Amino acid sequence: MENKKTIYFLCTGNSCRSQMAEAWGKQYLGDKWNVYSAGIEAHGVNPNAIKAMNEVNIDITNQTSDIIDANILNRADLVVTLCSHADAVCPSTPPHVNRVHWGFDDPAGKEWPEFQRVRDEIGERIKRFSETGE
């Protein structure tokens, strides 16, 4: 199906939140959307993000931490920023690109339950989007 839409999840370091969002996006939206994630910087995939997603049987060990790709950004149908920093510093998006902000706490450097909570919140938000388009 070549006429898939493109959704692009952005956060500061493409380490935790946007990695989880990419994985949930592929699970819930993969049949209709090309799903990508990136950051203003590339901090590497957080090992606890990998562990948290493994807990819900989603393997993100092959996902990479990438900086924002202008080509993907410019052709994206929807850009979703996941933290206030990325929302403020995100490159300008072309007029045809729909951009929304879904804020989630950054679990990096926090206790393990924070990773589980943020993982579940992101999963629920993307599931809702897959069901309602909002």
Curated annotation (Swiss-Prot):
Disulphide linkage map: C11-C83, C83-C90
Species classification: Bacteria, Bacillati, Bacillota, Bacilli, Bacillales
Species of the source: Bacillus anthracis
Main location: cytoplasm
GO molecular function list: arsenate reductase (thioredoxin) activity; protein tyrosine phosphatase activity
Keyword Transmembrane helix: no
InterPro entries linked: Arsenate_reductase_ArsC, Ptyr_pPase, Ptyr_pPase_sf
Catalytic reaction annotation: arsenate + [thioredoxin]-dithiol + H(+) = arsenite + [thioredoxin]-disulfide + H2O
Active site: C11, C83, C90
Purpose: Catalyzes the reduction of arsenate [As(V)] to arsenite [As(III)].
Cell compartments where the protein resides: Cytoplasm
Family: Belongs to the low molecular weight phosphotyrosine protein phosphatase family. Thioredoxin-coupled ArsC subfamily.
One GO BP annotation of this record: response to arsenic-containing substance
Gene3D superfamilies: 3.40.50.2300
Segment forming the signal sequence: none
GO cellular component: cytoplasm
Keywords carried by this UniProt record: Arsenical resistance, Cytoplasm, Disulfide bond, Oxidoreductase, Redox-active center
Enzyme Commission designation: 1.20.4.4
Transmembrane segments: none
Protein name from the UniProt record: Arsenate reductase
